[in-house]
Amino acid sequence: MSGRAFERYLTIQFRHLGYRVKLTSYSHDYGADLVLRKWGKKTVVQAKRYERNVGIAAVQEVVGSIAYYKADNAMVVTNSNFTKSARNLAHRNEVELWGRKEIQKKFHIKE
């Protein structure tokens, strides 16, 4: 699955959770791959399909997208996991992190 296919997959899954979802343009996305809306709140999402752990760059990108999209919340979603540095930076910036286990739980996926 390519990175863009992963973004499309997340679009479908978030819609099943009741979000309105906008998939941003592949280039010039200003740090967000998806823009979610639910209950009057806007959340920007950086999606990373990686075989290794996601580092701080993904968190930095999504934090940078908050102002551009006038978002209330931010999150990084990956099929993998996160480095300790990424977790620390996300915590400091109130960015929600969903790794493989969170995706399976939130989207009700059985291994």
Each predicted region: which residue ranges?
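Mixed-charge (Asp/Glu-Lys/Arg
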Residues: 1-111
